[in-house]
């Protein structure tokens, strides 16, 4: 494809410019009602999509290959291309054709790329890879997790199996170890990598001895874990399993940490799923909170951020320190200085684990060398700004002597494996240099010997060679073999040649082979000694990697706050959530139109909001954004709002949407009630609770009764900070009956038969549900909508009569409705009249003129 744009039409010149920006992917170029592809893209798409390949005039004197797909059907074509491993740039018209001079302005608005396939044999770069052991004793459940790629060793004790199930769902271990007599094995049904282990591996005394040996201690009191006896049993099992499988020392596993529920804002499995933190409801990673927040430049930073998202902390001092660092990095404009340096650090955490396991390859050591080289510049650009940042920088340390060691020891670009040799740099070891010089000198010696022997024997076909089986040899063609001197000893006969050895060559062969073998052996020895030289400072380097991970996360959050217009939230020790101009962090990134920001105000005197409004009005988005903003505040991030004050939170619960759990034999309603039961049992006055459409999976009476009772329990008993979305308008009378309850609604406007969703939150209850208008938007047949309107009018009339008769404060719509008095409503398909029946019975082709006339009179009579 030529790039001399002056030879092309203006439209094709525009296309070629856009294509040059996206050279390696297909470009869907919007032209009217079609997406067009040109040149090689057209040929490729035509073959992949089985669409026609045509030509579009000429440009630069040559016909232009072209293919196209209708814009309204583009998603199907995109899906096929993505499934074939192709990526597509979608180019839209953004200018106005009516006012454009020349081609309409266009730009690439999105790039559709295929999802990545996860190979179980490969380590997921930006996800933790954990082995976990679970244990239960006297009703106390525990889990111990070990990340072999970092040495991170955590234990937790939990009150029940539901809490353990939630923890497993958060961690998603690659392997789960459990005792042969584990009593709650049913919670493991949906996991892979299950390993039943003998009960003795979970014995407490065995575990304590094993852990003390690993850490080189006489007591575990220094780690603060000695009282978590059930968790220690699990820790002993997982450490035993690690040692059993690795069959080597594990020096990078040098501590153990007890995670307390009181330290974190707890999220159950349903909440993690509904909020789409790191995985969307379809199982992918697109359009999740992590997808928006995670622009970390190191894999280890990305993994740390995901841990923060799944385990927000309640330590306000630590949160404020994180905020201070984010604030400082923004104000001091250090983001663009630090991120390139951090990017060069790479995955130092996992490299160090491989060093500890002595499995690091030569290129791991060159990457470690590169990482260590960045540390002085990182420290220089991050220190002397705030006390919090200085404390973090202090953990990075100085490893200049180790960097110098690796600089001297390893060549710039080593081979993949040490066994290939050529890894240790020249000048690092004198003995190695001597052996290498001897090996390298073999070529010149053999050339000289070949010339000398050829001249001495007069055999012009004589040459010296080498193979792995016979070593060095002198080869002479069969035609001249009779000229071989007596001291030539035959070593091998070939079809066209004879191979010989002479004492001088044999002596040199032994010397060279010894040199090569000695060189490889010495190089391997020196390489292993490098691990010994690195190991004394392994713990310090691990601390540095942890600090660099945190700096990467905080620099990333500073960049996100700056790019996405986030603000610093404040914390209050009082109950409540006060957000002004709040936005959904994910939805605002995928919407083409501006996101409608909304407030929320909850406190001890106003702790339950009944949220009403139409379907598609934004109730679920509104509730999720409140939870996500609160969660973001509790990881130390800035938040998408004009301002936000978040009170003390201990848990976040969501009951949003539901589907059948066929694997467990549970219906949609059963899933819904199970989640609701968990909330009612576990929620406290400091919990944030989001309830969306409870009671839909059963009869109207049951559903309304359950919804009413749940709302009343949350308002009176737990007094949790609650948003309760519902289409049961009877619940809007709760504020008049219960303290701390208020109504809000998502606004909408109806004009004739259409509806406009305003997506703005207003005080008070919605006036109506707009269900019929939404049904019409969904394409429900007009006759069905008309019938529904008739039924609705009748039911509303009955409701009004019932209210007047019984003075029912709840305004029951259906309770006590006498449907037996329903007037006859025009059915969808009316019965045929006698006239229609007669007309339908006539076959004009079979009638004589007289019969046709008689039929006409008969029809006229029926009309009368």
UniProtKB/Swiss-Prot annotation:
Gene3D superfamilies according to UniProt: 1.10.1420.10, 6.10.140.430, DNA repair protein MutS, domain I (3.40.1170.10), MutS, connector domain (3.30.420.110), P-loop containing nucleotide triphosphate hydrolases (3.40.50.300)
GO MF terms held by the record: ATP binding; ATP-dependent DNA damage sensor activity; damaged DNA binding; mismatched DNA binding
Any one of the GO BP annotations: mismatch repair
A GO cellular component annotation in the UniProt record: cytosol
Family annotation (Pfam families): MutS_I, MutS_II, MutS_III, MutS_IV, MutS_V
Keyword Transferase: no
Binding site for ATP: 613-620
Cited SUPFAM superfamilies: DNA repair protein MutS, domain I, DNA repair protein MutS, domain II, DNA repair protein MutS, domain III, P-loop containing nucleoside triphosphate hydrolases
UniProtKB keywords: ATP-binding, DNA damage, DNA repair, DNA-binding, Nucleotide-binding
Coiled coil regions in record: none
CDD domains on file: ABC_MutS1 (cd03284)
Keyword Transcription: no
Family: Belongs to the DNA mismatch repair MutS family.
Function: This protein is involved in the repair of mismatches in DNA. It is possible that it carries out the mismatch recognition step. This protein has a weak ATPase activity.
Stated name of the protein: DNA mismatch repair protein MutS
């Amino acid at each position: 494809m030529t790039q001399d744009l002056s030879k092309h039409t203006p439209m094709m010149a525009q296309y070629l410019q856009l294509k040059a920006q996206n050279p390696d992917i297909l470009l869907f170029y919007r032209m009217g009602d079609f997406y067009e592809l040109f040149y090689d893209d057209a040929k490729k798409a035509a073959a992949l999509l089985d669409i026609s390949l045509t030509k579009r005039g000429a440009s630069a004197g040559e016909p232009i290959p072209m293919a196209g797909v209708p814009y309204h059907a583009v998603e199907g074509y995109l899906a096929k291309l993505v499934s074939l491993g192709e990526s597509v740039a979608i180019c839209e018209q953004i200018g106005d054709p009516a006012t454009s001079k020349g081609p309409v302005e266009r730009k690439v608005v999105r790039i559709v790329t295929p999802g990545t396939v996860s190979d179980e044999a490969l380590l997921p770069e930006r996800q933790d890879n954990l082995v976990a052991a679970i244990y239960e004793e006297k009703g106390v459940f525990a889990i111990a997790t070990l990340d072999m790629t970092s040495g991170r060793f955590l234990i937790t004790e939990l009150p029940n199996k539901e809490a353990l199930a939630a923890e497993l769902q958060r961690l998603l271990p690659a392997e789960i170890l459990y005792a042969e007599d584990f009593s709650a094995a049913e919670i493991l049904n949906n996991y892979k990598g299950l390993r039943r282990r003998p009960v003795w591996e979970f014995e407490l005394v065995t575990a304590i001895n094993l852990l003390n040996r690993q850490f080189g201690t006489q007591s575990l009191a220094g780690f603060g874990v000695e009282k978590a006896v059930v968790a220690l049993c699990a820790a002993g099992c997982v450490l035993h399993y690690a040692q059993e499988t690795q069959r080597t020392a594990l020096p990078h596993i040098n501590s153990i940490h007890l995670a307390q529920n009181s330290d974190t804002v707890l999220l159950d499995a349903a909440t993690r799923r509904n909020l789409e933190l790191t995985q969307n409801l379809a199982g992918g990673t697109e359009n999740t909170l992590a997808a928006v927040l995670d622009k970390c430049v190191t894999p280890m930073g990305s993994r740390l951020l995901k841990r923060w998202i799944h385990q927000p902390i309640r330590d306000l001092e630590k949160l404020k320190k994180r905020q201070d660092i984010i604030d400082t990095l923004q104000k001091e404009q250090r983001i663009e200085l630090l991120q390139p340096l951090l990017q060069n650090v790479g995955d130092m955490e996992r490299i160090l684990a491989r060093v500890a396991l002595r499995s690091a390859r030569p290129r791991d050591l060159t990457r470690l060398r590169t990482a260590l080289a960045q540390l002085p510049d990182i420290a220089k650009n991050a220190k002397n700004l705030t006390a919090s940042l200085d404390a973090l920088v202090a953990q990075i340390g100085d490893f200049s002597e180790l960097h110098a060691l690796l600089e001297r020891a390893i060549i710039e670009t080593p081979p993949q494996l040490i066994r290939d040799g050529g890894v240790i740099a020249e000048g690092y070891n004198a003995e190695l240099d001597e052996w290498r010089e001897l090996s390298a000198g073999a070529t010149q010696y053999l050339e000289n010997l070949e010339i000398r022997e050829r001249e001495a024997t007069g055999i012009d076909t004589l040459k010296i060679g080498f193979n792995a089986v016979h070593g060095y040899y002198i080869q002479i063609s069969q035609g001249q073999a009779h000229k071989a001197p007596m001291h030539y000893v035959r070593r091998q006969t070939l079809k066209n040649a004879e191979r010989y050895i002479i004492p001088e060559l044999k002596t040199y062969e032994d010397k060279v082979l010894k040199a090569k073998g000695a060189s490889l052996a010495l190089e391997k020895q020196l390489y292993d000694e490098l691990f010994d030289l690195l190991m004394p400072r392994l713990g310090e380097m691990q601390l540095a990697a942890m600090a660099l991970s945190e700096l990467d996360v905080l620099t990333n959050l500073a960049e996100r706050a700056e790019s996405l217009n986030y603000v610093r939230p404040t914390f209050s020790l009082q109950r409540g959530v006060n957000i002004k101009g709040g936005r959904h962090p994910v939805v605002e990134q995928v919407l083409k139109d501006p996101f409608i920001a909304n407030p929320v105000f909850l406190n001890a005197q106003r702790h339950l909001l009944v949220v009403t409004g139409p379907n598609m009005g934004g109730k679920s988005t509104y509730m999720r954004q409140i939870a996500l903003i609160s969660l973001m505040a509790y990881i130390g991030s800035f938040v998408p709002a004009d301002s936000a004050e978040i009170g003390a939170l201990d848990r976040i619960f969501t009951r949003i949407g539901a589907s059948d759990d066929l694997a467990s034999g549970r219906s949609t309603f059963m899933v819904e009630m199970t989640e609701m039961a968990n909330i009612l049992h576990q929620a406290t006055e400091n919990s944030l609770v989001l309830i969306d459409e409870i009671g839909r999976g059963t009869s109207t009476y049951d559903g309304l009764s359950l919804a009413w009772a749940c709302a009343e329990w949350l308002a009176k008993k737990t007094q949790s900070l609650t948003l309760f979305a519902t289409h049961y308008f009877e619940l809007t009378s709760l504020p008049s009956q219960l303290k701390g309850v208020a109504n809000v609604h998502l606004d909408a406007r109806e004009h004739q038969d259409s509806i406009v969703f305003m997506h703005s939150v207003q005080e008070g209850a919605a006036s109506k549900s707009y269900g019929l208008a939404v049904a019409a938007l969904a394409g429900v047949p007009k006759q069905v909508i008309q019938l529904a309107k008739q039924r609705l009018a009748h039911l509303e009339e009955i409701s009004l009569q019932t209210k007047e008769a019984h003075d029912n404060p709840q305004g029951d719509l259906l309770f006590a409705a006498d449907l037996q008095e329903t007037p006859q409503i025009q059915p969808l398909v009316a019965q045929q009249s006698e006239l229609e029946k007669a007309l339908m019975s006539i076959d004009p082709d079979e009638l004589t003129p007289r019969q046709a006339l008689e039929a006409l009179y008969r029809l006229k009579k029926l009309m009368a």
